[in-house]
Every structure is written in C-alpha cells, then in structure tokens.
Amino acid sequence: MTRPPEKPSDQKDSFWKTKTLEELSSAEWESLCDGCGRCCLEKLEDEDTGKIYFTHVACRLFDVGACGCSDYPNRSAKVPDCVRLTPENVRTLNWLPPSCAYKLVAEGRDLYWWHPLISGDPNTVHEAGVSVRGRVVATEDEVDDADLEDHIVRWPTLLPKRARMKRRA
C-alpha cells in the first residue's frame, strides 16, 4: 500500500493497539503504511517451491524520489497485478516484509520506533534503512522480464539492524 509520504496521522491514540484491521477507518488503514516501498518491488515466484524472491526493480508507477506510487488512486487500473492489501490478504501474503505494519498489527504486535505513527516523522523509515530509497536500480519498464532473475536481492526480506533498535540512535 505504498503511497507518497504524507504527514503522520493526527490520531492521538494508538488505534493499531486497540482495533483489529477490520475495525480501522480508511484514514487509519492508509496511515499504517510506513512508505517503505518494499511491496512495490517486483517479485518472482519459484514455480516448483512457491518461494517468493524480491528484486531491486520497482513497479513502473513507483516514484523513486518520493519513494511511493506516482498514481496511487489509479494504480489498480494502470497496473492490473498491483496487490491491494486488505485485512484478509495481509494474513496470508507470504511475501510481506517483516517490517510491514499491516502484518505486525495482524499478528498483534506493536509498530517499530521508526514508523511515522510512532516517530511523528515520515523520514524515520528512511533513516532506519527500512525503505527502498537509494536501493531501486530500475523500474519494470527498464528491465526485460527475462532478466529479472539477475536482479534478485535478499534485503527486502530482512529487517535492518538499526531498525531493530528500540529507539532512534
């Protein structure tokens, strides 16, 4: 659910601790997205094992500078295979990164210190090394499908060390 970074939610309470994903308002749902951009990376699936591999190639709508979708409201029409996260599918998508707030909330866990709802700063996701900023090498329009295997990377499935810290360094 990557979108261009916005001001953090003006929620005074920690709604993600008291509500289920199904109970969230649209604004609360959208504010859970930390703007990391990991879900906008192209992924490959091993047909034999079902294992998902991330690449450092982004969707054609991904704005590398803003680290978000360049046409978020129309993304599904322009990119038919864009996965819209829902309360149902975040519990079953096996490729969501370990830092994904939707996944964390679905598992009853709290958000990390760098999440904009916690820090009050949309840049902490970048400071913590969680976002794809500076790591995307191309968009899908620039790489042939046959060459995507050459762009497989492991980092999107990992949580950076500084992101695991309890607070900002």
From Swiss-Prot:
Protein name: UPF0260 protein OCAR_6616/OCA5_c14500
HAMAP family: UPF0260
Top-level taxon in the UniProt lineage: Bacteria
Family assignment from sequence similarity: Belongs to the UPF0260 family.
Species this chain originates from: Afipia carboxidovorans (strain ATCC 49405 / DSM 1227 / KCTC 32145 / OM5)
